[in-house]
Amino acid sequence: MPRRPSSGRRVLKHQPLTFSPFMRLLSFASMARRDLSHPEDCQCSDEDISFDEKQKIPNLPRKGKEEQVSDSSDEEDSQEDVQADFEFFDPKPTDFHGVKILLQNYLDDKEWDLSSFVDCILEQTTVGTVVKVADDEDESVFALVTALNMARDKDNKCFRELKEFLRKVCSEKNIANNLEMLLEKKAQDVGLLVSQRVMNLPPQLLPPLYDGLFDEVSWAIEDEPTEKLRRSFRFKSYLLVTKIYKLKNPKQRKPRHGEEDIEDTVFLKPEDELFLELSSWSFTFPMRSQLVTSQEMKNYQLMGLVMAVEANKIPKFRQMLNSLID
């Protein structure tokens, strides 16, 4: 179906985003090399990519090109500069392996029908975006954002397993009831917001990514060919499953003389801090799978974070995210 035209074009200057003393480090961290169940099937590259502080990105709130140009001449910069043109695309079947790589630890180390979950994402072409590098022969997927109705595919094995996983890791009884409501009784009004990407993707891509997602949701409510489909995008709540780092022993860890304050929580994705601030409820759980990290993160544990955000908070989120990145 044809996209509605969007207006406006802005050029932003890329600067590393810092939410904690470690966030600059994390923003340039290499994507951890992880094993696939069928590695021979994967045609996507996970080569390390780094970006310098003077890169500029035209900000397009629609599918199209997000140009990333490096013009750094700082010889003392230890990061290798790479010139890349990012483009936003509708999901398509050939993105299967790239999306599967991004999502392989989405439910920690649980064995589940991830392939069917990826299929659900790729079949929904009117809402959702994948980010690639222009003219990349491998068509590696660097980012994904989409929103899936929790009831539309409720009979799919992957959604049954996802719900089972969330119930199992939710140990807080007062929140378990709220979670159950979104998983079952109110599922038709819930969008599972899936956002995964390589860790060093420039943060300036975030506002157009999320603006595009929520614009597409609004358009789908009006433009989908059947009332059933239009109804499936009238989300009242969004459910998010993501990851953060938590300090292992916060009460015992005190900054030494001359050190910066130690953060209890490090957000791998800066927008997750905004979602958490706006959430109606949330809970964390320890993860058995661990990302490859630096020495600076040795005192932190990777945790899963599940949160619910009411749809009426999304305009505020978009405003906060744009202000943050600008």
Swiss-Prot record:
PANTHER family: BRCA2 AND CDKN1A INTERACTING PROTEIN (PTHR13261), BRCA2 AND CDKN1A-INTERACTING PROTEIN (PTHR13261:SF0). The keyword Phosphoprotein applies. It comes from the Eukaryota. Keywords: Phosphoprotein. The modification Phosphoserine is found at S45. Residues 72-81 have a biased composition (Acidic residues). InterPro entries: BCP1_family. One of its GO terms (cellular component) is nucleolus. Belongs to the BCP1 family. Coiled coil: none annotated. This is Protein BCCIP homolog. Residues 37-81 are annotated as: Disordered.
